[in-house]
Amino acid sequence: MSEKINTKPFILHSDFRPSGDQPQAIEKLAENLTDGLAHQTLLGVTGSGKTFTIANVIAQLNRPAMLLAPNKTLAAQLYAEMKAFFPENAVEYFVSYYDYYQPEAYVPSSDTFIEKDASINDQIEQMRLSATKSFLERRDTIVVASVSAIYGLGDPDSYLQMMLHLQQGAIIDQRQILAKLAELQYTRNDQAFQRGTFRVRGEIIDIFPAESDDRAVRIELFDDEIERLSLFDPLTGSSFGAVPRFTIYPKTHYVTPRERILDAIENIKKELVSRREYFIKEHKLLEEQRISQRTQFDIEMMNELGYCSGIENYSRYLSGRNEGEPPPTLFDYMPSDAILIIDESHVTVPQIGGMYRGDRSRKETLVEYGFRLPSALDNRPLRFEEFERLAPQTIYVSATPGPYELEKSGTEIIDQVVRPTGLLDPLIEIRPVSIQVDDLLSEARQRADKNERVLVTTLTKKMAEDLTDYLDEHGIRVRYLHSDIDTVERVEIIRDLRLGEFDVLVGINLLREGLDIPEVSLVAILDADKEGFLRSERSLIQTIGRAARNLNGKAILYADSITKSMEKAITETNRRREKQIKYNEEHGIVPQALNKKVGELLDIGQGANQKAKANKQRGKMAAEPTALYNAPKNAKEYQQQIKKLEQQMYKFAQDLEFEKAAAIRDQLHQLREQFVFDN
């Protein structure tokens, strides 16, 4: 990879010193990494300060790191925490930049082809570019990523070749600079100066780098010499001072040199000939005509413009790979001695394994029916075995490690059970199923009187809805967290729970990882003896742990018998509780309540996806999949209907129901046109 310019050490900022199990965990993790151990697991309970431990390990070893989280919300939470620990270093955020993404798809049963449709979040795109730049330029880099890290990214070799190096005193013609900027996909805009654009005023060129959000660079030429390079604020124009050199990175990760594009076109033509022969031989004349027309159009676009819609489907040729080779990803930008930390590994690891299979089945249909060449199958996320080969030294972090992590780590499972705050794991009670609803009503009233909160987890959506109605009818302030709610609204519901807008939150499988609410003093698990995924040992420990941040934490398991999963979960929780009690007695610690600011949670949610907050819809019941709409009477009604339709479209796209998503998209177009016409 490129030569590292910045070798600044990591400087950890914190008001706290490691305590409890943290010092021995930090020492052991660091020692294992120094000894070259490939896999180890940090078994850290809720509230034990796992992130602080990891931050100390990174600072102690002074090595770049990537933190993988299972979703955008937890990635944003980790990013915020790491940013606070390392304000002087490069802490970056790398998640999917799509607010909405509907991939190209074909439904043979109805002969429906759905074009790719996407909405890109400009802020997250800038953060992704900043992440790769930091990995290439700086040693003091921490990148917090979601599973987007295993998806194809532009080839780092092409990316590095395309950079524009500027140096004070260098001899370069103005036209050369402008031509190079155009190659990097920057556009000239002398009126609106924004990310990824440049403007020219006489012999002064201003460039707003694609990876920057608050700094632009000014090139002052004298004849054909760069007389001065300086940085300035693109909003106010105030100068940050002169710099001796500056590197302009491409506007996108997918930029490709002209020679590589021309080589790719020749290879695409050869594959097209082979594919046409196959379809003719199989008497599939419609597919033959379809692949010819679509591919020829793409070739012409690439020849003229250097890119085409869906250019990622030709990534095999553009990155110079052979058939079946893994795509370039964020891992290719990482320094070779980086550390990989997989947070909530019991969820994240299976996610990584499942990404390839889902993507493959959709693409195979496109190839079979002549919409794409077979080489499109190489535009894919990493296979799990490829991820294993590319992953550097790894730390798995979880309160309930999965079988994969335990097998890989062997004996290197580092316990972090003791909390510095002295807080104990919840007391567990088992009560009969026959009284669960009325007993829960009584418990909820007691907690509401003390200004405490309750989480309730059920087995089915129907039961969650019925229970919500029942509690509501009996005067309990209750909300239902369902699968139709997007990431940001989910965070806002949790915020409302913390603020006391309501007292009881009912859910199914949403009340587990990363839901840290200090105000929750009771977790109620209904039908705890129904063995299965939602009532496995791991699920039960995670759910019980939601009450571990409160001084009066309690978990009630409603069950008529004790399953093996329940027995293991209760034994493990009691083991942790006893260890904490012993530690508290030995060190004279009195458990202290957590005073986490409510605002922090909301900021985290908005950081994950700012645009989606417009989709806020506060109904307590699950959203209906389809709805009939009366003609809107005013602008406000139009906006409400548009938001409702957008939510449904996002949901269908997320569930891979592309046909339904496309139908709603068309409905949205009509509604917007009608809105413009009426107004």
From Swiss-Prot:
<protein>
    <recommendedName>
        <fullName>UvrABC system protein B</fullName>
    </recommendedName>
</protein>
<keyword id="KW-0547">Nucleotide-binding</keyword>
<dbReference type="InterPro" id="IPR001650">
    <property type="entry name" value="Helicase_C-like"/>
</dbReference>
<dbReference type="GO" id="GO:0009381">
    <property type="term" value="F:excinuclease ABC activity"/>
</dbReference>
<keyword id="KW-0228">DNA excision</keyword>
<keyword id="KW-0963">Cytoplasm</keyword>
<feature type="short sequence motif" description="Beta-hairpin">
    <location>
        <begin position="97"/>
        <end position="120"/>
    </location>
</feature>
<dbReference type="GO" id="GO:0003677">
    <property type="term" value="F:DNA binding"/>
</dbReference>
<keyword id="KW-0234">DNA repair</keyword>
<dbReference type="InterPro" id="IPR024759">
    <property type="entry name" value="UvrB_YAD/RRR_dom"/>
</dbReference>
<dbReference type="Pfam" id="PF17757">
    <property type="entry name" value="UvrB_inter"/>
</dbReference>
<dbReference type="GO" id="GO:0005524">
    <property type="term" value="F:ATP binding"/>
</dbReference>
<feature type="binding site">
    <location>
        <begin position="44"/>
        <end position="51"/>
    </location>
    <ligand>
        <name>ATP</name>
    </ligand>
</feature>
<dbReference type="InterPro" id="IPR006935">
    <property type="entry name" value="Helicase/UvrB_N"/>
</dbReference>
<keyword id="KW-0227">DNA damage</keyword>
<dbReference type="GO" id="GO:0005737">
    <property type="term" value="C:cytoplasm"/>
</dbReference>
<dbReference type="InterPro" id="IPR001943">
    <property type="entry name" value="UVR_dom"/>
</dbReference>
<dbReference type="Pfam" id="PF04851">
    <property type="entry name" value="ResIII"/>
</dbReference>
<dbReference type="InterPro" id="IPR036876">
    <property type="entry name" value="UVR_dom_sf"/>
</dbReference>
<feature type="domain" description="Helicase ATP-binding">
    <location>
        <begin position="31"/>
        <end position="414"/>
    </location>
</feature>
<dbReference type="GO" id="GO:0006289">
    <property type="term" value="P:nucleotide-excision repair"/>
</dbReference>
<dbReference type="Pfam" id="PF00271">
    <property type="entry name" value="Helicase_C"/>
</dbReference>
<keyword id="KW-0067">ATP-binding</keyword>
<feature type="domain" description="UVR">
    <location>
        <begin position="639"/>
        <end position="674"/>
    </location>
</feature>
<feature type="domain" description="Helicase C-terminal">
    <location>
        <begin position="436"/>
        <end position="589"/>
    </location>
</feature>
<comment type="function">
    <text>The UvrABC repair system catalyzes the recognition and processing of DNA lesions. A damage recognition complex composed of 2 UvrA and 2 UvrB subunits scans DNA for abnormalities. Upon binding of the UvrA(2)B(2) complex to a putative damaged site, the DNA wraps around one UvrB monomer. DNA wrap is dependent on ATP binding by UvrB and probably causes local melting of the DNA helix, facilitating insertion of UvrB beta-hairpin between the DNA strands. Then UvrB probes one DNA strand for the presence of a lesion.</text>
</comment>
<dbReference type="GO" id="GO:0009432">
    <property type="term" value="P:SOS response"/>
</dbReference>
<dbReference type="InterPro" id="IPR041471">
    <property type="entry name" value="UvrB_inter"/>
</dbReference>
<dbReference type="InterPro" id="IPR027417">
    <property type="entry name" value="P-loop_NTPase"/>
</dbReference>
<comment type="subunit">
    <text>Forms a heterotetramer with UvrA during the search for lesions. Interacts with UvrC in an incision complex.</text>
</comment>
<dbReference type="GO" id="GO:0016887">
    <property type="term" value="F:ATP hydrolysis activity"/>
</dbReference>
<keyword id="KW-0742">SOS response</keyword>
<dbReference type="InterPro" id="IPR014001">
    <property type="entry name" value="Helicase_ATP-bd"/>
</dbReference>
<dbReference type="Pfam" id="PF02151">
    <property type="entry name" value="UVR"/>
</dbReference>
<dbReference type="InterPro" id="IPR004807">
    <property type="entry name" value="UvrB"/>
</dbReference>
<dbReference type="Pfam" id="PF12344">
    <property type="entry name" value="UvrB"/>
</dbReference>
<keyword id="KW-0267">Excision nuclease</keyword>
<comment type="similarity">
    <text>Belongs to the UvrB family.</text>
</comment>
<dbReference type="GO" id="GO:0009380">
    <property type="term" value="C:excinuclease repair complex"/>
</dbReference>
